[in-house]
Amino acid sequence: MNWLTATADGVRLTLHVQPGARRTEVAGLHGDALKIRLAAPPVDGKANACLLAFLARGLGVSRSAVTLKSGDCSRHKVVDIRGITPEAAAGLLPVKE
């Protein structure tokens, strides 16, 4: 899984996001990234906030454990999540490969 790598204190996700979708959901793979559709529009950071909250909820970690590392104004994003193992993260994110 190229989209999921282990870090010292958790995992790093490589994501491709699609803001303005009908609903927020994991949509499968997009190249080497996990594709996530977001219901929030890409305006005033709403899509980023929606993404981080969605990941925190889905992985069962606090919102403060999820950090956007790069891609603030891009569809390609890198997110670090503390307090979860790669195995647990892969099991909690429904990916159709």
Swiss-Prot record:
TM segment ranges: none
Protein family (similarity comment): Belongs to the UPF0235 family.
Disulfide bonds listed in the record: none
Designated name of the protein: UPF0235 protein LHK_03181
Gene3D superfamilies: YggU-like
SMART domains: DUF167 (SM01152)
Organism of derivation: Laribacter hongkongensis (strain HLHK9)
GO cellular component: cytoplasm
